[in-house]
Amino acid sequence: MGLGQVFRYLFTTLLARWAGVELLGIYSLANAVTRITEVVGKLGLDQGILRKVSREENRENKQNAILSALKMGSISGLVFMIIQIALAGWLAEDIFNQSSLLTKVIAIHALSLPFYIIIHISAFSTQAFKLLKYKIVVTEIQNPLILLLAMVVCYFFYSAESAIIIPVVISAVLGCVTISMFLKKISGVNILSVQNGKFDRDLLTYSLPIMFISILGTVLHWTDVIMLGYFTDSATVGLYHPAARTAGIIRIVLLSFAGIYGPLMAEMYVKKQTSEMNHLFKLVIRWITTFSLPFAILMLIYPKKVMLIFGGEFLHAYPILMVLAAAAFIQAVFGIGGTTLNMTGFPKMNLLNTFIACGLNIGLNFYLIPTMGGMGAATATLITLSFIAFIRIIQNGK
């Protein structure tokens, strides 16, 4: 597990133990809304600038492209920040049927949007110079660490409510400052000169389709939380969140291998090394199974003890953990099939899979959550991921 995941897990654990189910649920709902707004607000410019700068040879053209992406991202971030603030009351009261506290949390979390969008665009810009360390330092170490530390300070020196409101904004602002310094060091681009950036139509044209792909993935990730908030209450969301975060540990194994596996598979595909591709595919699945199985077994055999980490009031959410652990294990083992499709010339097929998964998951949540609550959301996730795994087995077999 990377440092960032450790810090995020500690954040969830301590917030659950100190703030309780209700406040954790409110934080989860506001976070889900903000993450979905963020992926729309980025306009796909993070991935777009990675491609454009990587292919550009002239340094000045690289700088102009980065300034253009930052300017468009900044404007978009401000626009979607205002939209989220304006919709905060409607979302909290009419969609989630919650108190004014959720309105406040959604509105204040919106202030982080321009900063997080700049962070992502800047981080991918540094990656385009074939330097991954700066992106990792800010997005995977500093941001989650500041989030954790700010939450602890807010809780002990202010209030439990401030611990779910302020840390997100502090983390975003400090992360933006740090990545801006790194970006200037590597590319010579000063973020204070962003007003000089020009509108790059080609960059935006390439980036927007990526945005829609990202939206599908983000919606699939947050559907359970959003729909639990719609059909139930923040306490149910608060019980569900730690179980989902814990089961997510299993998926980290998939992400770790996918980063190495993807480029290798793409290279073999270009060289038409079919037998080597088949061997690599089976080898990676074997390794993913080996490393993820112990986590899955632990969560399936000792779910009550695992949930006690978050406090006694989370104990009765252990069946949710068991179902989500099974779902995460299936995704970890068969998820590499999605990477295979992308790297072997079938990205549209993978996009179709994600679209089907979103539709299926939303439909199942509509049907199961009203009668089963958190278990309904977990069951919907299990069925969806099992279905996609089955589809990928067939597709990769061909």
Report the location of each language-model feature.
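Helix-loop junctions and terminal segments of transmembrane helices
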Residues: T12-T13, K42-E57, A128, A243, ...
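Signature of the first transmembrane helix
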Residues: M1-Q47, S76-I85, S112, L147, ...
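Interfacial segments at transmembrane-helix termini and the short loops linking adjacent helices
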Residues: A88-H109, S234, K282, M299-F329
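Interfacial/gating helices of multi-pass transporter permease domains
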Residues: L14-R35, T103-K104, I166, F199-Y206, ...
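Membrane-interface helix-loop junctions in multi-pass transport and translocation proteins
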Residues: A16-I26, F129-K133, L145-V177, M181, ...
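Interhelical loop/hinge segments that connect adjacent transmembrane helices in multipass membrane
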Residues: L101, E161-P167, T178-H221, I260, ...
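Helix-terminus/linker motif at the lipid-water interface of multi-pass membrane proteins
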Residues: Y9-L23, A92-I95, I215-I249, E267-M268, ...
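Membrane-interface junctions at transmembrane-helix termini in multi-pass inner-membrane proteins
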Residues: F115-I141, A325-I356
